[in-house]
C-alpha cells in the first residue's frame, strides 16, 4: 500500500436502504469531474442503459462549475442516457454529511485511467465496494491497490467489457451484496489501508 487514510473519530452510521425501498439500483462516483474521461462515460452509459439503475455524481469536495456539469450531462445524453438517470449531488459542508451521502450508493464506480483515491477510501469506509479498472502505472493503480488490500480482487476489471460485466453482475447478485455494509467497514478498518500509525512508522524507518 502506498498510502494510509485517516478518518473522523465519529463515523456516520451505515444505512443502505433495502432493495424493496429503492425502485432503482444506485451506482455512484464522487470523484473529481475532471477525472471522468470519455472512456469512463462510455462504460457508465452502457451500464445505466442496460440495467434498472441510476448514477449519482458529485464533484469530490467542492462544487463543479455549471459549464463542467452541463458538459457531463450532454455527454451522457449523447450516449443515450436519460437525463433523470444521472443525478448530481451538492457538496456538503462537513465531512459527516459528506460521508453520509455514500448511503445513497449501492456500488461506487471508479474513474479511469486516473482512479479515485480519497473517494475510494471514503467509499469502503462507508461500506460501499468500489469497482475499479486495472492500471499500468502508479497513478492508475490506486484503486487496484485498495481492493487488493481488502482481498476484493473480483472488483478489479481487466478492461471496459469486464468493467461492464462486473457492474451488472453485482447489481443482480443479492448474495454478494449482503457481504458489504458494516462488514466492509470493519474489514477496511482492520486493514493496512487505515493503519496510519504503522504506515508512518514504516515510512520513517525507510527514511
Label every PLM stretch briefly.
Residues 2-94:
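Conserved catalytic-core segment of nucleotide-activated headgroup transferases in glycan assembly
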Residues 27-29, 56-57, 88, 108-110, ...:
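Structured core elements
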Residues 31-33, 49, 53, 57-63, ...:
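C-terminal amphipathic helix plus adjacent low-complexity
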Residues 39-40, 68, 101, 143, ...:
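Residues at alpha-helix caps and immediate loop-helix transition turns in enzyme cores, especially N-
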Residues 94-98, 119:
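Short acidic active-site motifs
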Residues 102, 111-196:
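Catalytic binding pocket for nucleotide-activated donors in carbohydrate/polymer assembly enzymes
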Residues 105:
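An anion/phosphate-binding loop that grips the pyrophosphate of nucleotide cofactors and donors
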Amino acid at each position: 500500500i502506498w498510502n494510509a487514510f485517516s478518518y473522523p473519530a465519529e463515523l456516520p452510521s451505515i444505512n443502505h436502504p433495502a432493495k424493496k425501498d429503492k425502485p432503482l439500483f444506485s451506482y455512484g462516483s464522487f470523484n473529481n469531474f475532471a477525472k471522468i474521461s470519455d472512456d469512463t462515460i462510455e462504460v457508465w452509459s452502457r451500464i445505466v442503459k442496460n440495467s434498472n439503475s441510476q448514477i449519482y455524481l458529485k464533484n469530490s469536495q467542492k462544487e463543479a462549475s455549471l459549464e463542467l456539469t452541463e458538459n457531463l450531462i450532454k455527454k451522457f445524453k449523447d450516449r443515450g442516457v436519460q437525463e433523470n438517470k444521472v443525478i448530481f449531488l451538492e457538496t456538503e459542508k462537513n465531512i459527516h454529511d459528506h460521508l453520509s451521502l455514500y448511503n445513497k450508493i449501492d456500488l461506487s464506480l471508479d474513474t479511469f485511467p486516473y482512479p479515485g483515491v480519497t473517494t475510494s477510501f471514503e467509499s469502503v469506509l462507508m461500506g460501499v465496494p468500489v469497482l475499479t479498472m486495472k492500471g499500468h502505472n502508479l497513478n492508475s493503480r490506486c484503486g487496484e491497490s485498495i481492493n487488493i488490500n481488502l482481498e476484493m480482487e473480483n472488483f478489479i476489471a481487466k478492461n471496459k467489457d469486464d468493467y461492464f460485466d462486473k457492474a451488472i453482475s453485482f447489481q443482480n447478485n443479492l448474495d454478494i451484496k449482503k457481504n458489504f455494509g458494516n462488514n466492509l467497514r470493519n474489514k477496511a478498518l482492520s486493514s493496512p489501508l487505515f493503519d496510519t500509525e504503522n504506515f508512518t512508522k514504516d515510512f520513517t524507518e525507510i527514511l
